[in-house]
A protein has these predicted regions:
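An N-terminally biased module of ancient metal coordination in phosphate/nucleic-acid-related enzymes
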Residues: 1-229, 236-242, 249, 350-367
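Non-catalytic, alpha-helical, charged scaffold/linker segments
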Residues: 27, 244-367
């Protein structure tokens, strides 16, 4: 009864549709038709679905494609649909800031899967914000620690050193650009190590064009200088569009440089894999002895699956090892907590120290 009073049927119907997409990873064929980029948000789509519903489904559709390994064109198409829905169909002069809050709210809705009460609350907030009332939007900007940006989108905001999933980051290029828009960043420099793939550059620049963000390409190299390694960042300039960047990467001199960079990355990958072998041969037993957990041998294939399209680095290796050990550590910690319930005062001190020791086994320690 209480839930019925707090959330209306529209909230619950939208929750069902969103969770169907989250669980299946796909939007129904009928709903997919409303995401066709050839259809204007103010056109025939208004006859088959509401503005709020289309925005919600466009956002969850994109978020699912960002994480399911979908191809570049599918991600870019989903991003374009989202951009058109939250910007061009908005009946408010506060549309840029409204779109930023709506995207953040949908991310929270997806994260809250499994907690129906929290999802319904967020969906109710989503539908309130979708109306574009400046007072409500400003309240949610503050809640999510987002600065209000001018609706002319002419602010001087930048981030001159970020990484996507192809290097040290966790987000593919489309996701990175979408998050930059939410944060109000207008200029972005995305850094890669030693080389960059033309497919990655295509996605990055096309996504930036869709979202109205100025993006620059940076490639970090290492070189020897006075018997030491120094790092320097190369940021080529003078590009007018995606095609001009891709043409530059196809130039013989640039291709030769990229091939050398690939060779460096291949060498670095082999070094990391040798470290994985050393972990299995030596360090796993040491961790088992020190922390009292049975550490399994880790396979190269599992590590490759964990890294995905990202860079094979020692930091990624330490994070992978930690992800494999975490369930074992949690199980051991739960066992110690149960022992604490019936332990003597003297034993409780020992068990508390054991819990503290288990809590110290982080990816930073492993690194």
């Amino acid at each position: 009864m209480n839930q019925s009073l707090r959330f209306d049927k529209k909230d619950r119907d939208l929750l069902v549709k969103i969770n169907e997409v989250i669980d299946s990873g796909n939007v129904s064929s009928a709903e997919q038709e409303t995401f066709r980029t050839s259809l204007h948000p103010h056109g025939i789509q208004n006859m088959v679905s509401t503005h709020e519903e289309r925005m919600a489904m466009a956002e969850v559709n994109l978020l699912q494609r960002l994480n399911d390994g979908t191809g570049v064109e599918a991600r870019l198409s989903a991003l374009k649909t989202l951009h058109e829905e939250v910007l061009y169909s908005a009946q408010t002069p506060f549309r840029f800031n409204t779109s930023r809050v709506l995207i953040q709210l949908m991310k929270e809705i997806v994260r809250a899967r499994g907690n129906e009460e929290e999802q319904l609350r967020l969906i109710h907030d989503f539908q309130k914000v979708a109306a574009g009332n400046p007072r409500i939007v400003r309240a949610f900007l503050s809640k999510f620690f987002l600065l209000e940006m001018p609706e002319e989108w002419n602010q001087k905001t930048m981030d001159d050193h970020v990484h996507d999933a192809n290097t040290m980051g966790r987000k593919n290029s489309t996701y990175l650009v979408m998050d930059a828009r939410v944060k109000g960043i207008r200029r972005l420099t995305v850094v890669y190590y030693n080389f960059v793939d033309s497919k990655v550059v295509y996605e990055l620049y096309e996504a930036a064009h869709i979202m109205g963000i100025s993006v620059r390409l940076g490639i970090k190299f290492k070189a020897r200088f006075h018997d030491r390694y120094v790092e320097f960042l190369w940021t080529p300039k003078g590009f007018t569009d995606t095609k001009s960047v891709l043409d530059f990467l196809k130039e013989p001199e640039t291709e030769a440089l990229m091939q050398e960079g690939r060779a460096v990355e291949d060498w670095a990958r082999e070094e990391v894999l040798q470290t994985l072998e050393a972990f299995n041969a030596k360090h796993a037993a040491e961790i088992s002895k020190e922390w009292g957990i049975e550490v399994p041998l880790l396979s190269e294939k599992e590590f490759d699956d964990y890294v995905g399209m990202g860079q094979t680095t020692l930091i990624r290796l330490s994070e992978f090892v930690h992800s494999q050990l975490l369930p074992l550590v949690e199980a051991e910690a739960e066992k110690v907590k149960q022992e604490l319930l019936c332990a003597s005062a003297e034993d409780q001190g020992v068990l508390q120290e054991r819990l503290k020791k288990l809590d110290e086994l982080t990816s930073v320690v492993l690194y």
